[in-house]
Amino acid sequence: MNLTEGRVVFEDVAIYFSQEEWGHLDEAQRLLYRDVMLENLALLSSLGSWHGAEDEEAPSQQGFSVGVSEVTASKPCLSSQKVHPSETCGPPLKDILCLVEHNGIHPEQHIYICEAELFQHPKQQIGENLSRGDDWIPSFGKNHRVHMAEEIFTCMEGWKDLPATSCLLQHQGPQSEWKPYRDTEDREAFQTGQNDYKCSECGKTFTCSYSFVEHQKIHTGERSYECNKCGKFFKYSANFMKHQTVHTSERTYECRECGKSFMYNYRLMRHKRVHTGERPYECNTCGKFFRYSSTFVRHQRVHTGERPYECRECGKFFMDSSTLIKHQRVHTGERPYKCNDCGKFFRYISTLIRHQRIHTGERPYECSVCGELFRYNSSLVKHWRNHTGERPYKCSECGKSFRYHCRLIRHQRVHTGERPYECSECGKFFRYNSNLIKHWRNHTGERPYECRECGKAFSHKHILVEHQKIHSGERPYECSECQKAFIRKSHLVHHQKIHSEERLVCSMNVGNSLAKTPTSLNIRDFTMEKVYH
């Protein structure tokens, strides 16, 4: 039986750079690369990938290039003899470290694991086997550092157990969470899962502290790694490192149509469909064609109703994983997209793009009728109804239609009697927030509307508008009976009562009684005209 069948080996998760790509990385990025390699190795080790048969050769002993041509498989930094896993602190780890070029170190220098502090033996020279006694005890409480000498030694104390990031340069202090293996029983207990790390949030248990620490980021929403090229944040350094290849890697496959380049040929092939219009995937249910298989698969769920992705927090189901990931940010509070102008964070990239138009002043949506420009497509859609007269929102109670949904919601309170806005001073309730704001000025005495002519201030805008007619001489309300004009509509209404009373008296045909009361009518007429002129 093949013991390696179905296993994930280090080669499967390794990330490689060409010499040119390696040259583009700064010191922090190179250290991060080492961090990622250590994380991957620690994870594989925790799964038992290198604790098999005695004669099984560690995959890393075959060697691999990390962008420095002098350091290759033909020149291994450790002994080429096979080393049993129980005799070292993890042979694959040594090969990784010795192949990473440290900034400021000559390519011929190498990086080794320092076992002097770990296992109380002197530093070994290049090519010598590193071994330990039977009664080894890792000292988890010590502070270790990177030794810069002819050979570079990196302490990987408890490398299988601790997160790789804590071992890179210097342990910050005693790791009380992780206990040393005092004897064989302790080591076996850890491997059998008896000493687990339990998550206090969801109750999950982990045998590897690295996995435990990484898991906790799901609950905290922590994204420690920020790309200084595009501002994206990443939860795990491995994902961050993979993303950075987008900026540093060569794009050798170029589209002849638009000049766009791609890292992989299959991506170029997919892209070409944009120009050719090819849509090879057809839906048998509705006959629609799709450019990409992933889009086709998602579309089919519309017909089947399948929602295979479930949110563990609220139990909601989603058609695709990307929608689930976006939804989960509601629970975690994660906002991975940052605006470089104002520092604001956003949950979705589409929201960031919309927001950035505030800074750029971009208004990409133009009305084809009047030429007005809008920042958002939704604003253009609403504006378009001014030209079409469309009123898509209809009240089910009275049949009245409205142009905007918010107007329908406001209107429906007339039927329901709902008055959701309460004055904290007098307890009065109002149907609309605007009415509450106006009412509040009765308590505060605020008069925000001032007349530019005389300086008089008013609490409501409509009172100011009527007042300004005194200065302008405008009399927009005219009596149809006698053509007299008035400043306010209320004045016209009162005036029109004079004419209605006259008609009433005439219709009664009281004869001489009309002659007896002209004075009273004249006085009333005079009084009304005096008041409302």
From Swiss-Prot:
A zinc finger (C2H2-type) spans 197-219, 225-247, 253-275, 281-303, 309-331, 337-359, 365-387, 393-415, 421-443, 449-471, 477-499. Residues 8-79 form the KRAB domain. GO terms for cellular component: nucleus. Keywords: DNA-binding, Isopeptide bond, Metal-binding, Nucleus, Repeat, Transcription, Transcription regulation, Ubl conjugation, Zinc, Zinc-finger. One of its GO terms (molecular function) is zinc ion binding. The keyword DNA repair does not apply. It is found in: Nucleus. There is a cross-link at K516 (Glycyl lysine isopeptide (Lys-Gly) (interchain with G-Cter in SUMO2)). The keyword Ribosomal protein does not apply. Gene3D superfamilies: 6.10.140.140, Classic Zinc Finger (3.30.160.60). GO terms for biological process: regulation of transcription by RNA polymerase II. It comes from the Eukaryota. Its main location: nucleus. May be involved in transcriptional regulation. Belongs to the krueppel C2H2-type zinc-finger protein family. This is Zinc finger protein 548. It comes from Homo sapiens (Human). The lineage of its organism: Eukaryota, Metazoa, Chordata, Craniata, Vertebrata.
